[in-house]
């Protein structure tokens, strides 16, 4: 190929304080695209650059004004307490023990008798709703009567008050005085309408952007932090944060049977990759993939109508958009014409972002996600 200069399939992440370095790296590496990142701003000096401009786009966060005005449509997840052994005929369990308090908030707004579940883990039996109560004041569930020396757990819904990815980035990068981004639910009626209008406004307000880089769509994989802001439980394929009474009501209508929290909780294993999934959990996954793909296609269609390309980041809020499942190809994204090759650019950008410093070119962030 001689001295022919090759370019393409490399995306450079940037920020307002590294414009010269970005241009130099583009030249050295033959990059053909530039993008911003979570926690950065796209530089004015690169808006007319001779490359495609990608914009990270967050469908479920970065608008706390909306989230706070519509608390009933904040995203939710299922949480299970640890196992507690009854030492007498009465047992109290504090729901938020071992969980970072600024990340989650117990959802006692919706019918707790319908959407929570207390289980005697020694026998596997569900404790009757008549035999337990919840105190808003203490945050405790009290089981009365309990069977002495039996183990009990409580499965409950919680609002996601700090987006897990934003929290990770803030903690790892030691961001100071950053408002916690609340995760809102695009699946629900008011937020759905708002989100489609928000996307159109963004496209029109950013004519320099060629590609909307969705990060990702609607539901975060399972990522929960403990009371010290450490990762408590992580499952890149976990569905426990893709739930709400609104979604679960729809699921029940489709499958024709009543939903149980245990379909998600799975004795505390949360249906991780080492478990054999139940029929009910596979039904739930299939339902989620269909609904997520349908809604994602709506956003991709708007992107195309506004004259831009649509690309998906593989990770973060990707639940229901798994590229190895059949529903993915119905979304209509531009990049992934081939399942693997189409996503190479995205992962390459992530790897460059995490690379160690190279001479005068500093690593932009220690960020792992987004």
Language-model-detected regions and their locations in the chain:
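Glycan-processing catalytic domains of CAZymes
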Residues: 1-370
């Amino acid at each position: 190929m001689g001295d022919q200069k090759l370019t393409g399939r490399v995306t450079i992440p940037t920020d307002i304080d590294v414009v010269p370095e970005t241009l130099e790296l583009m030249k050295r590496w033959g990059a053909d695209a530039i993008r911003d990142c979570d926690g950065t701003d796209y530089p004015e000096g690169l808006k007319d650059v001779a490359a495609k401009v990608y914009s990270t786009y967050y469908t479920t966060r970065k608008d706390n004004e909306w989230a706070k005005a519509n608390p009933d449509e904040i995203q939710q997840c299922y949480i299970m307490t640890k196992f507690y052994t009854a030492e007498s005929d009465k047992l109290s369990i504090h729901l938020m023990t071992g969980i970072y308090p600024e990340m989650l908030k117990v959802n006692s707004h919706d019918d707790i008798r319908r959407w929570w579940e207390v289980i005697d883990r020694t026998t596997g039996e569900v404790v009757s709703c008549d035999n337990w109560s919840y105190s808003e004041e203490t945050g405790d569930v009290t089981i009365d009567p309990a069977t002495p020396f039996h183990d009990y757990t409580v499965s409950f819904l919680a609002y996601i008050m700090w987006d897990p990815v934003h929290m990770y980035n803030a903690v790892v990068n030691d961001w100071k005085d950053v408002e916690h981004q609340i995760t809102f639910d695009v699946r629900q009626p008011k937020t759905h309408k708002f989100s489609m209008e928000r996307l159109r406004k963004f496209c029109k307000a950013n004519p320099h952007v060629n590609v909307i880089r969705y990060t990702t769509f609607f539901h975060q994989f399972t990522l929960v932090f403990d009371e010290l802001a450490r990762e408590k439980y992580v499952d890149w394929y976990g569905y426990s944060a893709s739930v709400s009474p609104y979604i679960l009501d729809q699921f029940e209508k489709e499958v024709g049977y009543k939903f149980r929290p245990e379909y998600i909780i799975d004795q505390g294993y949360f249906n991780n990759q080492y478990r054999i999934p139940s029929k009910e959990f596979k039904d739930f996954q299939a339902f989620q993939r269909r609904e997520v793909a349908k809604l994602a296609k709506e956003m991709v269609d708007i992107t195309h109508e506004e004259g831009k390309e649509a690309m998906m980041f593989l990770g973060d809020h990707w639940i229901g958009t798994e590229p190895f499942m059949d529903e993915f190809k119905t979304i209509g994204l531009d990049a992934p014409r081939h399942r693997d090759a189409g996503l190479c650019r995205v992962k390459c950008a992530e790897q460059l972002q995490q690379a160690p410093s190279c001479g005068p070119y500093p690593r932009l962030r220690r960020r792992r996600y987004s």
